[in-house]
């Protein structure tokens, strides 16, 4: 499922989780609708409500939806880094206690098996796992690029995965490079980085694989400080 479709389907959930209790109390007898133009969303204030003492959430940076419609929430709360809901908001499972800087979450169908990619700011790593948390691959700071001298310089925020399994990591809180690996985690190339030219990025916070043009897929990268999206070919041009 691409990001645009997922966002449209789950915006109700995201806004609902973000609402302040005071807002909900004041309007509990009214419909709460957000959005503009033809993209409007009605809040379901009862969706996904859990006992905070048992299932705490710090920051929720991202959610994804698997092929069965389950919604997977990522938080940097190490009591339960992953919280999985069904479509109706009922808790299915939780797992994860080793991701204190959990930030980016990507789901990918790998030969019929869905896997997750977690960006951890504190660990300066990207971790690939099964849907139930078994670690399959860990990508450490990309020393092989020649751009990094220590792990602290690398603070990945997001990944996107190409159909062939190539992994693109956006170092959004680090040096703003996009690092490309093959499906085994072998380094291929890097591009972007900080600078003043059009090819450079400033806070490369998000990245996605855009295949709307099937013959010419591209990468779309956010350059947050420039208030811009930048398009790159799959080889970084």
Model segments located where?
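Blade/loop signatures of beta-propeller domains
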Residues: 27-45
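N-terminal export signals
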Residues: 5-25
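Conserved beta-strand positions in repeat-built beta-propeller and related beta-rich domains
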Residues: 73-77, 116-121, 169-172, 211, ...
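Beta-propeller domains
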Residues: 73-93
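Structural signal for beta-propeller blades
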Residues: 80-82, 124-126, 176-178, 227-229
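Beta-propeller fold detector
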Residues: 43-48, 93-96, 136-143, 188-193
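Short loop/turn segments that connect beta-strands within beta-propeller blades
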Residues: 86-88, 130-132, 182-184, 233-235
């Amino acid at each position: 499922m691409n990001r645009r479709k997922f966002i449209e389907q789950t915006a109700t959930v995201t806004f609902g989780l973000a609402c302040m209790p005071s807002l909900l109390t004041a309007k509990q007898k009214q419909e709460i609708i957000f959005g503009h133009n033809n993209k409007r969303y009605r809040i379901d204030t009862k969706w996904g409500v859990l006992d905070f003492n048992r299932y705490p959430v710090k920051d929720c940076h991202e959610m994804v939806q698997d092929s069965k419609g389950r919604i997977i929430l990522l938080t940097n709360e190490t009591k339960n880094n992953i919280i999985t809901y069904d479509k109706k908001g009922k808790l299915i499972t939780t797992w994860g206690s080793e991701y204190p800087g959990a930030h980016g979450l990507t789901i990918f169908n790998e030969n019929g098996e869905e896997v997750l990619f977690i960006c951890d700011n504190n660990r300066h790593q990207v971790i690939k796992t099964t849907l139930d948390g078994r670690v399959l691959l860990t990508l450490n700071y990309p020393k092989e690029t020649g751009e990094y001298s220590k792990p602290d310089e690398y603070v990945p925020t997001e990944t996107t995965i190409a159909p062939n399994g190539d992994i693109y990591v956006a170092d959004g809180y680090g040096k703003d490079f996009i690092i490309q690996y093959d499906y085994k985690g072998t380094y291929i190339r890097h591009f972007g980085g900080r600078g003043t030219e059009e090819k450079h990025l400033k806070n490369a916070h998000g990245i996605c694989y855009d295949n709307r043009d099937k013959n010419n897929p591209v990468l779309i990268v956010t350059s947050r400080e420039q208030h811009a999206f930048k398009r790159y070919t799959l080889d970084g041009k």
